[in-house]
Curated annotation (Swiss-Prot):
It comes from Listeria innocua serovar 6a (strain ATCC BAA-680 / CLIP 11262). It comes from the Bacteria. InterPro entries: Com_YlbF, YheA/YmcA-like_dom_sf. This is UPF0342 protein lin2326. Belongs to the UPF0342 family.
Length: 117
């Protein structure tokens, strides 16, 4: 019987959204967005992350100013309980995504392991 892999993917999407980890992440994100100070700090943190990633991806050097700003913003974020909570929830969700990715990649790993035997 043929499986529509896209239907399976949509079921996985729905399942992820129903996990306690995702629901907790949504709640934590809502709490950050409802607090003006936390929201501003979190947005600044994300902007700095994107800037650093863009520089890394394009081979640009990360200058001292960017490093200093990143350190300052990271310190501010660590001092905000709402953002710390959000990051903890993100980490829990990341663990699930990594586990799912490992499961999804198993058929390819098995294929190449058999081919190499």
């Amino acid at each position: 019987m043929a499986v529509n892999i896209y239907d399976v993917a949509h079921d996985l999407d729905k399942g992820i959204r129903e996990t306690p980890e995702f629901i907790s992440l949504q709640d934590a994100y809502r709490e950050v967005n409802e607090n003006a100070d936390a929201k501003a700090k979190f947005e600044r943190f994300r902007d700095v992350q994107v800037t650093i990633q863009e520089k890394q991806m394009t081979g640009q050097e990360i200058d001292d100013e960017t490093v200093n700003v990143a350190q300052q913003v990271a310190q501010e974020v660590q001092e905000n309980e709402l953002i710390v909570k959000l990051m903890e929830k993100e980490q829990a969700m990341s663990t699930i995504i990594n586990d799912l990715n490992r499961i999804i990649m198993t058929p390819l790993q098995d294929l190449y392991n058999v081919a190499n035997d």
